[in-house]
Amino acid sequence: MPTINQLVRKPRKSKIEKSDSPALNIGYNSHKKVHTKLAAPQKRGVATRVGTMTPKKPNSALRKFARVRLSNLIEVTAYIPGIGHNLQEHSVVLIRGGRVKDLPGVRYHIVRGALDTAGVADRKQGRSKYGAKRPKG
């Protein structure tokens, strides 16, 4: 416990809040080739690699992911939610924040039903999260 005198000489530092999705808080000026501060809810990017990854213990699965080069030239790993997808290398995707707890290093989700990503087929409930259209009839 510091004394009052010690606190007067050197006050306490306030905690720095760290972003959960730092790549969304950076923009890029391509004319000046410089990164800027520009917070965005989503960002567009190009898939450079699409594959599967195994989760941490105690879970077991093959989780689908894509390595995405964003419009601000930062490369991130993003999770592809839902059953089945149509993504390939060079697909243009939209990413949002949101980590996947059992995949280390995955801090972003790909938005289904936006840009080149198709919505999940034959989905009846929770459709908006997976870009599925309303079934007819």
From Swiss-Prot:
Residues 1-21, 34-57 are annotated as: Disordered. InterPro entries: NA-bd_OB-fold (IPR012340), Ribosomal_uS12 (IPR006032), Ribosomal_uS12_bac (IPR005679). One of its GO terms (molecular function) is rRNA binding. Keywords: Methylation, Ribonucleoprotein, Ribosomal protein, RNA-binding, rRNA-binding, tRNA-binding. GO terms for biological process: translation. Transmembrane segments: none annotated. One of its GO terms (cellular component) is small ribosomal subunit. CDD domains: Ribosomal_S12. The modification 3-methylthioaspartic acid is found at residue 102. Pfam families: Ribosom_S12_S23. Part of the 30S ribosomal subunit. Contacts proteins S8 and S17. May interact with IF1 in the 30S initiation complex. Belongs to the universal ribosomal protein uS12 family. With S4 and S5 plays an important role in translational accuracy. Interacts with and stabilizes bases of the 16S rRNA that are involved in tRNA selection in the A site and with the mRNA backbone. Located at the interface of the 30S and 50S subunits, it traverses the body of the 30S subunit contacting proteins on the other side and probably holding the rRNA structure together. The combined cluster of proteins S8, S12 and S17 appears to hold together the shoulder and platform of the 30S subunit. PANTHER family: 30S RIBOSOMAL PROTEIN S12 FAMILY MEMBER. This is Small ribosomal subunit protein uS12. The lineage of its organism: Bacteria, Bacillati, Bacillota, Bacilli, Lactobacillales.
